[in-house]
Every structure is written in structure tokens, then in C-alpha cells.
A protein has these predicted regions:
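Conserved, short, structured surface segments that act as functional micro-motifs
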Residues: 358-361, 382-426
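Short, well-structured beta-strand-loop connectors
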Residues: 336-346, 378-393
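N-terminal Sec-pathway targeting helices
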Residues: 1-18
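Surface-exposed, glycine-biased beta-strand/turn segments
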Residues: 249-354
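Surface-exposed, short loops/turns at beta-strand junctions within beta-sandwich domains
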Residues: 119-129, 140, 226-233
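Zn2+-dependent peptidoglycan hydrolase active-site motif and core
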Residues: 325, 339-374, 396-399
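Cationic-aromatic interfacial patches
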Residues: 161-249, 254
């Protein structure tokens, strides 16, 4: 019995010595290379860590080895970056980040996570300093428990952080894209402006009409109308961004819209014209709102017959008259009058000149004007969805789609054709 006990004690001591040796060897041979790679980039350049603290688990987490490198005052110089929003690329292991960005005067312009940085806009070109810390912690762990083996992961993985400090000079220039360089009368051209700093609204000047910019995912968007009566040939488009003017040329191609026999119209009363100007004309120059449509538009009248189409020359008693900036339809009385696309009602009421009238703002300066309804079922300020009834049709419906004050061809909207549908989400 005594021998057996001595043997058991010997085995236990041997195992303990062996485990101790294994732990010693494991601890000794675990170096800084056991830490996760610090593969972090900013603006396409690799960042150099200037401080770190990592807890590397040994023997399945039964033992830890800590590698600590105190943060220094060293600041990495990245030089000149030519993009308005340098991309921050992080290693796959990153769980938590803290980023601060200062201007040359030391004012903190941004303090938040890498995810929040995606929505940050640099106010201007110039010099900046940034500090970034990237952590890896187990699920349910916190950044204050890095030196504790929490046993929250199986198998155990390294936990810790890298710190980066860097300077850079931002020197970004705006980039302008047009959806097309040539457009037929009645069409539209999309404009995308990106690559600029700050939140100043770009200004677009052209003789084709008033053009307003609205915020988009990576900059600004706008739409240029080429109305039925736009002069054919080249038109200068001047885009001014942060004091820099970029010029593009847009060529308008002539289109034959044909003629149509039309009945003579009685001159409207001065009071009717004045009421219309007071109620509707201010909408032409109203501030552009965010884009609301997505995809093609639907015709306001599901079943109809065209009486006068967009751009047609009206012929009365053999005499050619004016060209139509709108489309007049023969419709089924009482049938629903539909919103052509998502939008907000900006006018709903009766006018002496146009009868029951509904105007829907679809964003980016595009509005649909619906005249001659039998009934109105929406009110000003109401949000409507594509295809939603906004009232009941009468015998005739006049529809006019305008970018600002210039009418565009509604057929292209119903066909999902033209600049209004270019890079819709970008």
C-alpha cells in the first residue's frame, strides 16, 4: 500500500513537472507574432501601429501572455490624399473602434466609430491629424477587461488593441458626371457630383432651365431638362463647387413631336390667370427636396385616350398654333387618378383656370401637375406612394411633368428611360 501511494505521488509530481515544462516552453516560444496582424489602411496607405496591448492565450486559455507596447508621440505622415473621403480599411478581427480627427488648429471635428466615420464630411481641403484605436474583444467582453482571461471564447483567441496616429493633407477636387452628352428634346440628363469636401451646395448654371442639387449617397445629384422647345445644338453646363467651376457641354437633338387637330380654346379670364400664377408658379422655383421616386413612373390614368400629346403642335381650323407643354387625355369619369411616383402633395385645390388640381413633389425639383380632376382625395403635405389614388378622374385629365419650370416628356418617365433613372441609388 505504501509503495502504491508513493507511486501515485510520483506520477502526480511527474505530471506536474511535465505540465510545468510544457507551459514554460509554450510561454517561451509564444512571441509577438502570435498577435493578430495590424492590417489597417487609411486612404489606401498602410498605417503603422505606435502602441498596442495584446493578451495571447496559451494552453486553451489556461494561461495568458501579455504583449504591451506603450503609445508614443510618433505621428505617421501619410502625405497628400486626393479623395474627399479617404477610405478606412480595418482587419477582419476588429470588434470596436475609436477615431478622432482634428484640423490644423487642433479642433476636434470628428469623434466616433469607424462606422460613423462613413457619414463624416471633411469641411475643406487642408491638414488633418487622426488617432485610431482598433480593439478585438470576445463577445460580451469589454475594452476594459483586456488583461483578464474571461473564458468567453472556445477556443480562446487573442484580445487587445492597436493604436495609430497619423497626419495627412487633403487635396480633393470635384468630379462631375453626366448621364449623357446628347439628349433629345423632351428628355432629361442626370448629373452626379462627387469628390468634394464640405457641405456647400454646388451651383449649376445653364440656359436649359433652373437646376438644383440635392444630397446623394456619395455627393450631390441634379437633373437637367431638355424641354420640347429647347434650342438644338450645344449648351454649356457650368457647375461651381467650392469656388471651382467645371464646364461640360450638353448637345440637344431636335425631335419631331408631330401635329394634332385641336379645338379653339376660349381666352382665360385675367382673374383666372392671376390666381394660377399666384398658386402654381412659386412651385417652379421651390427648393428641391430629396429624391423620392424609385424606378419607372405609372400613368395617372390607367385607361385613357390621348387627345393632345406632349410637344405636339396644335392645329386649329387649319392654322398651326402653339406647341403643347402637357398631355391632355380623355379619361373615364370616376376612375382613380393615380400618383405617378412616390412624393409629397404640395398643392391640392380648385383653380378657376385648371379646375381641381393636384401637384406632387417627387424630389430633385421634379413635380407632376394634374389638372381637371372630378374629385380630390388628398391634402397638402400628405405623402403618397406610386399608384395611390389622389382623386377621381373627370372626362379629361391634363398632366404636366416639370423639372423646375421646364416641362419634360412624360412618356419617357413611364418607360423608365432617360437621366432620371441613371445611378438612382448613387
Amino acid at each position: 500500500m505504501k509503495r502504491f501511494l508513493l507511486w501515485v505521488v510520483g506520477v502526480i509530481l511527474g505530471v506536474a513537472v511535465l505540465l510545468g515544462a510544457v507551459m514554460t516552453v509554450s510561454y517561451s516560444f509564444t512571441g509577438e507574432g502570435s498577435r493578430p496582424a495590424a492590417d489597417t489602411q487609411f486612404g489606401g496607405q498602410a498605417l503603422e501601429a505606435n502602441g498596442s496591448c495584446w493578451q495571447v492565450p496559451l494552453l486553451g486559455g489556461q494561461l495568458d501572455k501579455v504583449f504591451a507596447s506603450p503609445a508614443t508621440l510618433t505621428v505617421q505622415k501619410l502625405g497628400v490624399l486626393y479623395t474627399a473621403h479617404p477610405e478606412l480599411s480595418l482587419p477582419d478581427w476588429t470588434c470596436y473602434t475609436a477615431l478622432t480627427i482634428q484640423n490644423a488648429a487642433g479642433d476636434v471635428l470628428f469623434a466616433g466609430s469607424a462606422g460613423e466615420y462613413q457619414n463624416f464630411l471633411f469641411p475643406a481641403n487642408g491638414e488633418y491629424k487622426a488617432e485610431l484605436t482598433a480593439w478585438r474583444v470576445p463577445k460580451d467582453g469589454t475594452i476594459t477587461q483586456l488583461r483578464k482571461n474571461l473564458g468567453l471564447e472556445r477556443p480562446a483567441k487573442p484580445t487587445g488593441w492597436y493604436r495609430y496616429s497619423f497626419r495627412f493633407t487633403l487635396q480633393a477636387s470635384a468630379e462631375v458626371e453626366l448621364s449623357a452628352e446628347r439628349v433629345e428634346q423632351g428628355g432629361t440628363v442626370g448629373v452626379r457630383i462627387s469628390g468634394m469636401t464640405g457641405d456647400a451646395v454646388p451651383a449649376i448654371e445653364t440656359d436649359l432651365g433652373s437646376v438644383q442639387c440635392v444630397r446623394a449617397a456619395e455627393g450631390w445629384r441634379a437633373y437637367i431638362p431638355a424641354a420640347y422647345n429647347a434650342s438644338s445644338g450645344g449648351h454649356e453646363i457650368n457647375i461651381t463647387v467650392n469656388g471651382e467651376t467645371i464646364t461640360r457641354t450638353l448637345t440637344v437633338l431636335p425631335k419631331d413631336f408631330g401635329t394634332v387637330e385641336a379645338e379653339a380654346e376660349e381666352p382665360a379670364a385675367d382673374s383666372a390667370n392671376a390666381q394660377f400664377r399666384s398658386a402654381i408658379w412659386p412651385l417652379y422655383e421651390a427648393a428641391a427636396t430629396a429624391k423620392q421616386w424609385q424606378g419607372g413612373f405609372v400613368p395617372p390614368a390607367e385607361d385613357s385616350m390621348t387627345l393632345v400629346d406632349y410637344g405636339q403642335i396644335k392645329v386649329t381650323n387649319g392654322q398651326q398654333g402653339s406647341r403643347s407643354n402637357s398631355t391632355k387625355l380623355y379619361t373615364i369619369p370616376g376612375a382613380p387618378c393615380r400618383a405617378a411616383a412616390n412624393g409629397t402633395v404640395v398643392f391640392a385645390g380648385n383653380l378657376e383656370l385648371t379646375g381641381n388640381t393636384v401637384v406632387i413633389d417627387h424630389g430633385c425639383g421634379l413635380r407632376s401637375y394634374l389638372y381637371g380632376l372630378q374629385e380630390i382625395s388628398v391634402s397638402k403635405g400628405q405623402t403618397v406612394e406610386k399608384g395611390q389614388a389622389v382623386g377621381a378622374l373627370g372626362e379629361e385629365l391634363t398632366m404636366d411633368f416639370k423639372l423646375g419650370s421646364r416641362s419634360v416628356n412624360p412618356r419617357l418617365l413611364f418607360q423608365t428611360s432617360g437621366g432620371l433613372f441613371w445611378k438612382e441609388n448613387g
